[in-house]
Amino acid sequence: MFTSLNTHSIFSKMRGTASLRELLAQAVKYRMSHLALTEVNGIWGFIRFVQFAREFNIQSIAGVNLITDYDDVILLVENQQGYENMCRIISDVHDSRDVHVADLLKSRHDGLFVLAHEKHVLKKLVKLIPDTHLFVELRPGVEERTAKGLAKQFQLEIVATGDVYFLSPEDQPAHKVLRTIEHNTTLTAIDSAEVKSEAHYFRTEKEMATLFPNSLDAINNAQYLAERCKTDWQFLNTIFPNMDLKNTREASRKLRKLVYAGAEKRYGRLKMGNPIENRDLRIVNSEHRITNNNSSASSAVKKRINQELAIITEKGFAPYFLVVWDIVRQTNATIGRGSGAASIVSYCLFITQVDPLKYNLQFERFIHPERVDMPDIDIDFPWDERDDIIDYVFQKYGLHRTAMVSNQVFLQ
């Protein structure tokens, strides 16, 4: 049995031509039990890959095709520690590609399997990584005798891969066009070293055996290695910057205090008595203002605030609202939008500018008791303040708890 352990999708920018679903469908067609996604210097599509793989009943393997100015290797994740190490290594490569893979792996190789096909890379890695986790990669473009020579020299096993960039040989011209665009040149002038040949398509086990007829053990080793990789993926834990508050209860208390202080700015002084029948709700400057004799309107505001805070506290979302409040108050010109505008808590924190009571907006559209994922508040900042605000967030909460989310754009 064969498993593809070196597979690129459209998330390998200007390189891969196959979508995640197309790759998984092909794996099912070829009766593969596992599939590794190894994009070039990134894991942009991996969470979607895991989700889609479950639909196809395929075991998903995390990996990366690590390419620096000097080296080209495949990393595959054995366990959670390996996944974390791989993520940090990828970040290091994005800081600078002027680095050797051996230096990247020196203190972060635990929990990772490494496949390399170049002698100068293996020569360094064999000193760092045990032979149980380091392999010679036999891929298209590498001769069998060369791989066997390296395996003998360094006393390592060989693993065969397809180094996949497209589904079939017919897709290679599309790959070439992508590489040409990437290098801002022409189809006739593109350096051939920058373009994969037709050999780099998604092969069946039989086709791999035809390509490498004297390396059947290497083909079988791919399945053996796949079964050693991590496949039980659960992305449930959230690393959250909680403003140095000791616990969620303290965060909830601080949030309540801020919300009620903001409510008095939004609505006027809130009366603490029982509701009365006479409702006198006046609009002043497009906001609800509570008159001195209107405890009914005051009660409606308090009731809505308490209802929202109860759900927010129960779900453990108080730190989230405090962080958003902290970021928003760095400027006076923010506009909160989306379903977050249905929250009176957001309104009283001046995150949003729309009164949900006035427009009868339902909080459950934003957060409901059954929700398990974190809420999402979209905020627009002035373009000329955006960089300063981002710098503030990184400085306030630290590099280890702050990240920017990439936006993926694809060619049709």
Q: What is the role of each PLM region?
A:
Residues 1, 5, 214-337, 411-412:
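Non-catalytic structural connector segments
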Residues 1-34, 40-157, 170-181, 217-220, ...:
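Extended substrate/RNA-proximal surfaces in nucleic-acid metabolism proteins
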Residues 37-43, 137-142, 166, 241-245, ...:
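Conserved short loop/turn motifs at secondary-structure junctions
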Residues 147-154, 302, 317-333, 389-395, ...:
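Short, hydrophobic/aliphatic alpha-helical segments
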Residues 159, 164-167, 331-353, 401-412:
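Conserved phosphate/anionic-ligand binding catalytic regions in large, soluble enzymes, centered on
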Residues 165-198, 354-369, 391:
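Flexible glycine/proline-rich, aromatic-decorated loop/lid segments
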Residues 205-208, 366-401:
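A structural-propensity feature for long, helix-poor, extended segments
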Residues 320-348, 359, 363, 389:
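Extended, hydrophobic alpha-helical segments in both membrane/secreted and soluble proteins
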